[in-house]
A protein has these predicted regions:
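Short, cationic-aromatic polyanion-contact patches
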Residues: 3-13, 27, 58-81
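Hydrophobic residues on short alpha-helical segments
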Residues: 13-21
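Key DNA-contact positions within bacterial/archaeal DNA-binding proteins
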Residues: 29, 40
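Alpha-helical residues within the helix-turn-helix
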Residues: 33, 50-51
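Amphipathic alpha-helical dimerization/coiled-coil segments
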Residues: 80-114
């Protein structure tokens, strides 16, 4: 495993795994577009997921598009996606709570000035 796949953020893995789970025949370009990450990051992420045993990659047979792949999360991959989803939600909830405190404080400050 190279260094780039080691340092990817768990949210990247979650987003990629979620898209693959929903759309197994999704292209790397479409993953990049929908997850708002670079095509290179998608490639490294897919490689890392495969090395962890969370993802299987199959080439479409008899497809005129020779670069078409089918992605499948392994049972361990589905489990890890669920685990990452819990962590993602927990982190986003904390971000929301912090932002709400900031908004409330700023609103109070502005209200008191007027």
């Amino acid at each position: 495993m190279n260094n780039k796949s080691k340092i990817q953020h768990p949210d990247t893995h979650f987003k990629v795994m979620d898209l693959i789970h929903k759309y197994p025949d999704i292209s790397q370009r479409e993953i990049a577009k929908q997850a708002s990450i670079s095509l290179g990051s998608v490639h490294y992420c897919l490689r890392a997921l495969g090395e962890k045993g969370w993802l299987k990659v199959k080439k479409f047979k008899n497809n005129p598009n020779k670069s078409a792949y089918f992605y499948l999360l392994t049972p361990e991959g589905v489990f890890q996606k669920s685990r990452l989803a819990v962590l993602f939600l927990r982190r986003k909830k904390q971000e929301y709570d912090q932002m709400k405190l900031q908004i409330d404080a700023l609103s109070k400050e502005l209200y008191e000035k007027n």
